[in-house]
């Protein structure tokens, strides 16, 4: 709204009304308008030790429906260029506008009662395909809570979907059919999801009962699948809209995930990738080797 100081067009966000309204200082032809470049009577005032100035003339402010200080739209409080872009979109094809940020949602909702409701479904769809962050993934979920989707991690990047499914079939004594499994793998991030197309409840419970388990904390249980020296950890995936190929590969991904894997491995009893060391001097194998060599020497002496 315009102020009571003559021809000024200053919004309440820049110049609040009330008892503490600051004193305005007038400078006749003190500035050049930002739009028309003509000189105009500018004003300045101070709020909380910050000085504000009018940077466009009242005529241009009235024409563009903007504040003389912040140049934002008077009604919606958004930048003028953003408002003009959205108006252009609305005029071209109002039904196709999808709000992409909070300002755009606010403007469309206030300026058109027809556009916003028509795009709610599209907006929800756009938000549903956002990138998942590592802290949102179900690394620490309870496998016993699995409804119909398993979450797999610590997968060797050289393994393929077919190889993992084959190992699952072996683990179920060939009772599980390949056509009944749906495994989505992200080799780069070493994660996957597993679902069953037929009898999902039955096969979910069967797999949980067959695979070896380990406990993380007092309440959380996980399963694991041994495969080519690699231990694939399995938990529950409780989110229906989770997509392994739509995960944000953050810089901290490796550090956070490796921390979880190392913790799991210590609970199971063997750290991942740990190799058997050489036998120490004085061990049984070492003594056995020495006795063999001594027998050979005695034979030669004879």
Curated annotation (Swiss-Prot):
What Pfam families does this protein's entry cite?
STL11_N (PF21369)
* An annotated GO BP: mRNA processing
Q: Where in the cell is it found?
A: Nucleus
Q: What is its main location?
A: nucleus
Q: Which GO terms describe its cellular component?
A: spliceosomal complex
One example of the protein's molecular function in GO is: RNA binding
Could you tell me which InterPro entries the record lists for this protein? STL11/RBM22-like_N, Znf_C2H2_type
Q: Where is the composition biased (Basic residues)?
A: 290-302
Sequence segments annotated as region (Disordered): 268-302
> Keywords on this record?
mRNA processing, mRNA splicing, Nucleus, RNA-binding, Spliceosome
Family in the record: Belongs to the SLT11 family.
Described function: Involved in pre-mRNA splicing. Facilitates the cooperative formation of U2/U6 helix II in association with stem II in the spliceosome. Binds to RNA.
Its quaternary organisation is: Associated with the spliceosome.
Q: What is this protein called?
A: Pre-mRNA-splicing factor SLT11
Record the organism.
Kluyveromyces lactis (strain ATCC 8585 / CBS 2359 / DSM 70799 / NBRC 1267 / NRRL Y-1140 / WM37) (Yeast)
Gene symbol here is SLT11
């Amino acid at each position: 709204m315009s102020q009571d100081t003559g021809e000024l067009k200053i919004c309440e966000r820049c110049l609040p009304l009330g008892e503490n309204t600051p004193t305005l200082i007038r400078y006749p032809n003190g500035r050049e308008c930002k739009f028309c470049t003509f000189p105009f009577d500018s004003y300045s005032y101070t709020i909380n030790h910050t000085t504000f100035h009018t940077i466009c003339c009242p005529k241009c402010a009235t024409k563009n429906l903007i504040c003389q200080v912040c140049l934002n739209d008077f009604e919606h409080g958004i930048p003028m260029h953003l408002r003009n872009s959205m108006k252009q979109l609305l005029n071209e094809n109002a039904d196709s506008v999808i709000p992409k940020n909070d300002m755009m949602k606010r403007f469309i909702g206030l300026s058109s009662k027809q556009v916003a409701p028509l795009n709610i479904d599209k907006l929800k769809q756009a938000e549903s395909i956002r990138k998942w962050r590592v802290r949102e993934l179900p690394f620490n979920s309870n496998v016993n809570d699995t409804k119909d989707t398993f979450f797999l991690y610590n997968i060797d990047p050289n393994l393929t979907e077919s190889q993992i499914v084959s190992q699952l079939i072996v683990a179920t004594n060939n009772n599980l059919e390949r056509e009944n499994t749906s495994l989505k793998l992200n080799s780069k991030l070493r994660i996957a999801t597993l679902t069953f197309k037929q009898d999902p409840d039955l096969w979910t419970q069967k797999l949980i009962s067959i695979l070896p388990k380990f406990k993380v904390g007092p309440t959380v249980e996980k399963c694991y699948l041994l495969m080519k020296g690699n231990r694939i950890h399995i938990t529950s995936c409780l989110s229906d809209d989770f997509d392994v190929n739509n995960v944000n590969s953050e810089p901290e991904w490796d550090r956070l995930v490796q921390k979880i894997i190392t913790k799991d491995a210590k609970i199971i009893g063997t750290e991942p990738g740990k190799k058997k060391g050489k036998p120490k001097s004085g061990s049984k194998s070492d003594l056995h080797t020495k006795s063999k060599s001594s027998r050979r020497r005695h034979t030669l002496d004879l």
